[in-house]
Design a protein with these regions (language model features):
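N-terminal segments that cap or nucleate solenoid repeat domains
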Residues: 2-38
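Glycine-rich hexapeptide-repeat left-handed beta-helix
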Residues: 1-13, 41, 47, 53-55, ...
Length: 182
């Protein structure tokens, strides 16, 4: 089961069409739209400002999203966030892709259809224009006018979320203790 925590009177709001994997933690002012998938080990934590995740966005394993007072995190629709990425009090517009291990800091804005490369660090307040590629530490825009980010990632994670909705714990001595062996 995911861990869903009420913090300071705020309970995460999760659309019935969203998928939250076992081991993920959602705490406080977190809002997930339909089709969102939050994968294993993700932490979405919001004590003082809202975390909003738009329709059909996938937050891959071990993603962290957090906010500071007065600095919300707004993730758009059809966004792909790669494994181990950290999004802190930033805005990521629709159809963007955040690479594995990337870090996006407070007040940064990632434009629609932009790509932040794996391991890049987007500084506080930095703007990555729509449809561009940002790479490096600190991130620099290296390429403009990218073709639209392929929708395969989004469609693939929508299908995976549906598959995992129906997953069951393995049972039997060769798989370790399952629900039958607790």
């Amino acid at each position: 089961m995911p861990r869903i925590l009420t913090v300071d009177g705020h309970t995460p709001r999760i659309d019935a069409g969203a998928f939250v994997a076992e081991g993920a933690t959602l705490a406080g002012q977190v809002h997930l739209a339909a089709g969102v998938s939050v994968w294993f080990g993700c932490v979405l934590r919001s004590e003082r400002a809202t975390v909003t995740v738009g329709r059909d966005t996938n937050l891959q394993d071990l993603t962290i999203i957090h906010t500071d007072e007065g600095v919300p995190a707004a993730i758009g629709e059809r966004v792909t966030v790669g494994h181990r990425a950290i999004l802190h009090g930033c805005t990521v517009e629709d159809d963007a892709l955040i690479g594995m291990g990337a870090i996006v800091l407070n007040g940064a804005r990632i434009g629609a259809g932009a790509v932040v490369g794996a391991g890049a660090v987007v500084r506080e307040g930095q703007e990555v224009p729509p449809g561009t590629l940002a790479v490096g530490v600190p991130a620099k825009v290296r390429e403009a006018e990218l073709p639209p980010v392929p929708r395969r990632n989004v469609a693939g994670y929508l299908a995976l979320a549906e598959l995992y909705r129906h997953a069951e714990p393995a049972r039997g001595p060769e798989h370790g203790p399952g629900e039958d062996h607790a």
